[in-house]
């Protein structure tokens, strides 16, 4: 079970089930700004003060390495991708369905759901056009009828979209998510290992990191892995297992910051603890296996994460 945290205090109210509690947020009640997590086989208990571990408890974990995902964690990238797609549709006057009076424009509400339904840029467009009709455009005056022409349409749109996305990232208008830079600097100052592990292509991640966290911080990472560096992508745990090996740190002493259930699954399968900073497109996902859930990292300090990791107690 995960603790869901927002900018207001963490509050506790009795639930209808004996021996359990529910978490509530309200400025009108007494808040608990710090908590520890005891994880048992049957249930989880949250407490403000330290609670003695069961005799059978395994050794406490120690935060030795902090690992960040990139898209969704360091930057909220999905809306930027949506903007780049819509700019491509406008540039090539993509009409879908062909009878439409205006170029295609994916709304924020639609894209939040769509990007969790179909992964990858080209598969997204292919799926959408198959469902809604292959479009007219300045690339093809009439809807493409054969596989080669359809592939050319999608390739052209994707290539233009990719370059547009790079322009947006380089524009200086994109900011990292709240608290990310401060938390990275805290970890480095405390002598913790720092890594970024992303399922995206290496060139895309490098572009984002150099422009958002700056080149000096990027070069100061103890480990950087992208989707190109492992055979299987998340939710396969390979990228996190490889990171632990390169960092020289036990998986149990690593803490991962993710934004989606796919990333959470990759971290937990690797044997690592994970906290979630959700986005608008992932907020409804099931994060029960995370040790904490936040809307962002603005109020999260390194000592908070150390306390979380140190007080995870698993019944033997």
Swiss-Prot record:
EC number(s) reported in the record: 3.1.3.-
Keywords of this entry: Chloroplast, Hydrolase, Magnesium, Metal-binding, Plastid, Transit peptide
Chain positions recorded as Mg(2+) binding sites: 69, 71, 259
Keyword Coiled coil: no
Transit peptide: 1-46
Cofactor: Mg(2+)
Gene Ontology CC entries for this record: chloroplast; chloroplast envelope; chloroplast stroma; plasma membrane
Active site: 69 (nucleophile), 71 (proton donor)
GO molecular function: hydrolase activity; metal ion binding
UniProt main location, coarse: plastid
Localization terms from the record: Plastid, Chloroplast
InterPro entries assigned: CbbY-like, HAD-like_sf, HAD-SF_hydro_IA, HAD_sf, PGP-like_dom2
Disulfide bonds: none
Family (UniProt): Belongs to the HAD-like hydrolase superfamily. DOG/GPP family.
This protein's name: Haloacid dehalogenase-like hydrolase domain-containing protein At4g39970
Lineage, opening ranks: Eukaryota, Viridiplantae, Streptophyta, Embryophyta, Tracheophyta
């Amino acid at each position: 079970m995960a603790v869901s945290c927002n900018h207001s205090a963490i509050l506790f109210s009795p639930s209808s089930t004996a021996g359990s509690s529910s978490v509530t947020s309200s400025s009108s009640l007494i808040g608990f700004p710090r908590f520890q997590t005891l994880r048992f086989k049957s249930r989880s208990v949250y407490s403000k003060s330290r609670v003695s571990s069961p005799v059978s408890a395994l050794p406490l974990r120690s935060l030795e390495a902090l690992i960040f995902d990139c898209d969704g964690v360091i930057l909220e990238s999905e809306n930027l991708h949506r903007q780049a797609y819509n700019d491509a549709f406008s540039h090539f006057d993509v009409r879908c369905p062909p009878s439409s009076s205006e170029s295609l424009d994916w709304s924020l509400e639609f894209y939040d759901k769509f990007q969790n339904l179909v992964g990858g840029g080209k598969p997204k467009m292919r799926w959408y056009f198959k469902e809604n009709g292959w479009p007219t455009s300045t690339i093809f005056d009439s809807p493409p009828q054969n596989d080669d022409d359809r592939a050319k349409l999608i390739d052209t749109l994707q290539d233009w979209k990719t370059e547009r996305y790079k322009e947006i990232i380089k524009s200086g208008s994109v900011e990292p998510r709240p608290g990310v830079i401060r938390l990275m600097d805290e970890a480095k100052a405390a002598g913790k290992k720092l890594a970024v592990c992303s399922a995206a292509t290496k060139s895309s991640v490098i572009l984002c990191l150099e422009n958002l966290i700056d080149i000096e911080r990027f070069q100061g990472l103890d480990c950087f892995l992208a989707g190109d560096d492992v055979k299987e992508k998340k939710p396969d745990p390979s990228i996190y297992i490889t990171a632990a090996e390169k960092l020289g740190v036990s998986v149990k002493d690593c803490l991962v910051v993710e934004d989606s259930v796919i990333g959470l699954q990759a971290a937990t399968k690797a044997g690592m603890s994970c906290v979630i900073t959700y986005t608008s497109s992932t907020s409804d996902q099931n994060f029960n296996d995370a040790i904490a859930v936040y809307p962002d990292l603005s109020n999260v300090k390194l000592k908070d994460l150390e306390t979380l990791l140190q007080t995870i107690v698993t019944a033997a």
